[in-house]
Amino acid sequence: MTNPVSTIDMTVTQITRVAKDINSYELRPEPGVILPEFTAGAHIGVSLPNGIQRSYSLVNPQGERDRYVITVNLDRNSRGGSRYLHEQLRVGQRLSIVPPANNFALVETAPHSVLFAGGIGITPIWSMIQRLRELGSTWELHYACRGKDFVAYRQELEQAAAEAGARFHLHLDEEADGKFLDLAGPVAQAGQDSIFYCCGPEAMLQAYKAATADLPSERVRFEHFGAALTGEPADDVFTVVLARRSGQEFTVEPGMTILETLLQNGISRNYSCTQGVCGTCETKVLEGEPDHRDWVLSDEKKASNSTMLICCSLSKSPRLVLDI
């Protein structure tokens, strides 16, 4: 991670097992430092001691300014992010983070919120539920997990639902005879002013999009985690022109991203997830047509071709001019 976005030095003060293969990590700043505000659904960028940068959702109540808490699932196919956190990170270690950003914000004025979560996708959803509880708003949760051992925050969720009189449907794959969580039913049954949220794996997101396809886009919100890059691998070479650097040009070779190309050539950029799910590397496009492969930008933004995420998106035109 590099400037101009400032980083904050944090210390790991507590590690808690939340469920099987799922830990929460409490991070606190230097004494006397007040952390930037955040809202439910926000994430922070974390720079790990092994050089890897990742984005993780915040799960603590949004009013807290003395700590950030993230919850991380151990991905057996991890390239070093979750595996490092689970196997090597210890209380007392220091990390640097990028302040919170939110691409999955809660609509606090909604008359009713319908929340869907799959696996570790519960993390931003749990943050939202805590905020909805503070507001006294109505909500319902539909949460799918592999099995009972993998349910994060089960006791807290059950208590929150009981206090709010909210519907809490827990779907366990191991007990469902191969059936997937029903998303279409809750969507159809919800009131016409309800706002819908979903965070989960790709299969769940596709089912969610199908279930909400006829709804106005402002009522449908979602966030991916661990997303695979979309689209076919690019075989074409293209040129990136940096408008703010006297038209400096770089060739992006097949198998490379714009971000990787810039970093290899000493051009520092802010980034975190490298998977197109956090939005940290969003960059303004001045000329050319991006090949959008992220999960953050809205369909309207993608159609405008005015901005792109350079960690994953490529180019449909032979030349891209970026506001860098």
Swiss-Prot record:
Residues bound to [2Fe-2S] cluster: 273, 278, 281, 311
Keyword terms, alphabetized: 2Fe-2S, Aromatic hydrocarbons catabolism, Electron transport, Flavoprotein, FMN, Iron, Iron-sulfur, Metal-binding, NAD, Oxidoreductase, Transport
Keyword Iron: yes
Enzyme class: oxidoreductase
Cofactors that this protein relies on: FMN; [2Fe-2S] cluster
Catalytic reaction(s) noted: 2,3,5,6-tetrachlorohydroquinone + NAD(+) + H(+) = 2,3,5,6-tetrachloro-1,4-benzoquinone + NADH
InterPro entries: 2Fe-2S_ferredoxin-like_sf, 2Fe-2S_ferredoxin-type, 2Fe2S_fd_BS, Beta-grasp_dom_sf, FAD-bd_FR_type, FNR_nucleotide-bd, MRET, OxRdtase_FAD/NAD-bd
Pathway: Xenobiotic degradation; pentachlorophenol degradation
Residue ranges crossing the lipid bilayer per the database entry: none
2Fe-2S ferredoxin-type domain ranges (all copies): 238-324
GO molecular function, one term: metal ion binding
EC code: 1.1.1.404
Cofactor binding notes: Binds 1 [2Fe-2S] cluster.
Activity regulation comment: In vitro, activated by tetrachlorohydroquinone (TCHQ) at low concentrations and inhibited at high concentrations (above 200 uM). However, PcpD would only be stimulated by tetrachlorohydroquinone (TCHQ) under in vivo conditions due to the toxicity of tetrachlorohydroquinone (TCHQ). Competitively inhibited by pentachlorophenol (PCP) in a concentration-dependent manner.
Induction: Constitutively expressed.
Recorded phenotype for the gene knockout or disruption: Cells lacking this gene show a significant sensitivity to pentachlorophenol (PCP) and 2,4,6-trichlorophenol (TriCP).
A GO biological-process term: pentachlorophenol catabolic process
pH dependence: Optimum pH is 7. It maintains more than 70% of its optimal activity even at pH 5.0. PcpD loses its activity quickly in basic solutions, retaining less than 20% of its optimal activity at pH 8.0.
Domain FAD-binding FR-type: 5-107
Protein family (similarity comment): Belongs to the PDR/VanB family.
Subunit structure and binding partners: Homotrimer.
Function: Involved in the degradation of the xenobiocide pentachlorophenol (PCP). Catalyzes the reduction of tetrachlorobenzoquinone (TCBQ) to yield tetrachlorohydroquinone (TCHQ). Also able to reduce 2,6-dichloroindophenol (DCIP).
Name recorded for this polypeptide: Tetrachlorobenzoquinone reductase
High-level lineage: Bacteria, Pseudomonadati, Pseudomonadota, Alphaproteobacteria, Sphingomonadales
Gene name as annotated: pcpD
